[in-house]
């Protein structure tokens, strides 16, 4: 926390499992992401063969931004057809998870499934009430039903949007779906073919942070102040990598006060910080009071500012004497 972007978690999980040929299909507002990822060196993916491949929208069709995973995959069909790997793993980047893709692949191979999906037994997060898939699973682990925007309360089998399948199978499914004008991988391919395809599910019992909107981003950041959550997401032996930035250690000026907070390198604290997550290079000036906030990289909080339940973008300056307050 305080250093990482959402893409770091899935990308690091792949790197930790020995996956070194990764294609990231971006949709919009991706320039900052490309700057963050660079050549992929921090994830050991700056390679002559394979490595990190970033595919912008309009790569082939030049018509509109992708509406669903099928259109996104259709844009990299040529890339998929020229690869040599037998299997493909797919994941969205809107979850913070330290995932073992090798365990998913092993389960897939053992079951003989066409597609294997990772799921979590949990109540549907508030931010995903209108964007979720849940699974009905039989005693053998086979998916018998896939529901879209499940409205039921209580614990459900929530699809994590992490899949593994053979590359040739994926190519065939995408080509067939594209020919029929279909858009969504889960709704149009998996759900409609649940009785034809052999779809198996593997439960994930580790820590998952679902980031769907600003509220969930705020909540999930502050949850990491709890050491139990932090240790669950960042276990020893399975590191999360990110872009390197050479900063000095955080400096606490005499008279400053910091309570129950996570601060990245390069911060300078002269005021009061309570129950906050501060990214790299944040400066809190004398007399400023910052509570229950997530302040991104290089935010400057000037003297006598009061912040409560605020999320800032990077390079934001809050001028002296201002009072900003949100709600939890």
Provide a role label for each language-model segment.
Residues 1-222:
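Unchanged
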Residues 168, 176-328:
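Left-handed beta-helix
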């Amino acid at each position: 926390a305080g250093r990482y972007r959402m893409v770091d978690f899935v990308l690091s999980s792949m790197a930790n499992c020995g996956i070194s040929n990764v294609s990231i299909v971006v949709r919009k507002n991706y320039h900052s992401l490309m700057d963050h990822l660079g050549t992929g060196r921090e994830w050991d993916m700056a390679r002559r063969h394979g490595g990190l491949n970033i595919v912008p929208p309009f790569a082939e069709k030049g018509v509109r931004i992708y509406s669903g995973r099928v259109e996104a995959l259709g844009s990299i069909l040529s890339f998929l057809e020229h690869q040599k790997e037998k299997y493909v793993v797919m994941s969205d980047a809107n979850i913070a998870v330290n995932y073992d893709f090798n365990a998913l692949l092993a389960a897939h191979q053992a079951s003989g499934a066409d597609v294997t999906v990772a799921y979590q037994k949990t109540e549907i997060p508030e931010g995903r009430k209108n964007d979720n898939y849940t699974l009905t699973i039989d005693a053998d682990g086979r998916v018998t039903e896939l529901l879209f925007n499940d409205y039921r309360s209580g614990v459900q089998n929530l699809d994590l949007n992490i899949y593994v399948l053979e590359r040739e199978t994926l190519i065939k499914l995408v080509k067939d779906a594209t020919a029929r004008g279909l858009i969504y991988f889960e709704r149009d391919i998996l759900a409609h073919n649940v009785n034809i395809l052999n779809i198996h599910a593997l439960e994930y019992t580790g820590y998952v942070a679902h980031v769907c909107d600003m509220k969930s981003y705020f909540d999930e950041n502050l949850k990491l102040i709890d050491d139990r959550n932090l240790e669950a997401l960042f276990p020893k032996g399975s590191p999360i990598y990110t872009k390197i930035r050479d900063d000095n250690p955080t400096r606490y000026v005499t008279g400053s006060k910091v309570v129950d907070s996570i601060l990245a390198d390069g911060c300078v604290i002269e005021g009061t910080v309570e129950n906050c997550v501060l990214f790299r290079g944040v400066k809190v000036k004398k007399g400023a009071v910052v509570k229950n906030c997530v302040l991104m990289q290089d935010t400057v909080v000037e003297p006598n500012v009061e912040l409560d339940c605020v999320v800032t973008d990077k390079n934001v300056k809050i001028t002296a004497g201002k009072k900003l307050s949100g709600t939890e």
